[in-house]
Amino acid sequence: MAGQIDARLAELGIEVPDAAAPVANYVGYVISGKTVFVSGQVPMKDGDFQYVGKVGDRISVEEAQEAAKICAINIIAQLKAACGGDLDKVKRIVKLGGFVNSTPDFTKQPQVINGASDLMVEVFGDKGKHSRAAVSAGALPIGVSVEIDAIAEIE
């Protein structure tokens, strides 16, 4: 039986993929006590990297927000794996760390990462409200425009 969070995802038309396997010497998440640390997630959808390029150059703010949303969906996939498939065990999204591959003069990192923050609140309600960092990066793996990591509390 689907839980409340799965029902909310379905209502929003969001399909959560299986948690992506790491591409280097790390794991997708670590659980310490009741805290889950999710490794940086990139905008990968259906096995393909989306929105590759620098924000402020090839990638618009709106496209970067979509990239951030895909990152958030991939974070939710990792949390689902960490919770044994039951997203209702997520008590709180504690923090998101957002990295934006942008031109040196780009200053709208917070608006970009809102793509992920807004989704967390849409999906988890008040439990999705979190602290956050939104910073610029000179480059990100594979040239993706956004990477986001997360900290969450679980039951």
Language-model-detected regions and their locations in the chain:
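Short, polar/acidic, helix-capping and beta-turn segments at strand->helix junctions
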Residues: 1-155
